[in-house]
Amino acid sequence: MMWRIRARALAKVCSTLPFVWACGAATPPAETAAPVASPPAAAAVIPSAPSDSPKRATELEALGFDAYLWGFAIVENYKAIYAYNVNTSGPEYKGPFNTLSSAARVYTPADKAVITPNSDTPYGFVTLDLRAEPQLLSVPAVEKGRYYSLQLVDAYTHNFGYVGTRTTGNKPGRYLVTGPTFKGPKPEGVDQVFSAETDFVLVVYRTQLFNPPDIQQVKRIQAGYSVTPLHELTKSAAPLPPPALDFPVWEAETVKGLGFFSILDFLLDLMPVVPEDAGIRQRLLAIGVGAPGKLDPKTFTEGDRTALLAGQQRGQKKLAELSVDTHFLGHEVTAGDLFGNRAYLGADVRRRDVGAMLGIYGNSREEALYPIYRTDADGKPLDASQSAYTLRFEKGKLPPAKAFWSLTMYDGRSKLLVDNPLKRYLINSTMLQSLKRDADGGITLTLQHASPGKAQEANWLPAPNGPFYAVLRLYYPEPAAYDGSWKLPSLVAIPKPAKP
């Protein structure tokens, strides 16, 4: 959300929202038409007018707009996969496909591939290539009281499955992930099968870290995670390797232009058409996106290039505008509205795009909630160069989470963690014993750029010297977090940053 908003409401909005057509318009213009999700093929406008005619330009601009909005999350997902598994010389490279990479550390400001990262749980990542055969995810026993999860994300950014504390418990287990063409039975010794709509699946591992010395136990748990191909479980012959792929280079400037359509074309070859997307996939064929062969935007006529770029740029503008609209679904939008499986998110691709723009790979609401603070109690944008802020939890009214909660600081411009002398990027429930209590037993946190002084640093969450936002994460939330019985406290601005 980024435009006219009820600023007070924005304090509750989650850390991910980007584009939305005007809801409820009786006859919306082309730019605010019904969600591009998957219009029926019969109703779709497929460019058919003669080359370079005004009608064709109009049709192509509309297609460029719709294609950008429908494909945005898909292409954003590729950005992370390219960094993690393709660009071997890049700083974020983690290893080949089907190879688990676990880091026994938490995110810092030096990590730049994923915006709005969680720094409570050391991560593990594996991108599964399921073209040749399914992959088996094995997990060890995890002690009671420690949260862990494996989040399964397809190429659309749908969360289509979970393994972990909430869903399968902390016992050891083996879970098979299959691609869209796999038809085999459930193998013996497998606890559950997760079927993906796409051949490439990102699995995000999160393992709770209680405190710095606890990192050794996290390492032991991570060492118990494994990924193995199905043929090793069944002791059968290995299948033939899948064809080598010519992965397109990810370059931010290129993707801002027609390179976006080249990457989308590459990805759709790996994503079988599902009924919900038949309409938009048929329309994209008119410009060669998703058709056999490699798309080369240089083969477009000048008129077609101009029209597609105009539509794409309208889509970019719309995303930027809608990323600050807190009510684009007809009610106050939270992160719980933005992440989930296909059935939950439905045909409205605005939801997955908003999530991908401001915090890709967010959890489904049952797994975690992400209220975000972007404004203070008076509705003013947060800016630590202008004010200091306090956040008070009354006695007995800490965030209700069965696993844990955390409050993390982010730079308002980069959407990354904030460098600071204490190397403190968050305050969470495992730190409660070290926090100073108010006289009545409540807890008041201070969010500001300058240190409030040694005596007050225990409750200080350092902010950048400028715009910022803070995300409150509740892992495995209690019902009170859903039903409204727990109220999210507001950030209160104090006139000047506190001086040491």
Feature roles, as predicted:
Residues P29-E31:
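Auxiliary, metal-adjacent structural segments of Zn-dependent hydrolase domains
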Residues A33-P500:
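A compositional/structural signature for long, glycine/proline-rich flexible linkers
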Residues G24-T27:
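Bacterial signal peptide processing site
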Residues M1-A7:
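N-terminal secretory signal peptides that target proteins for export/translocation
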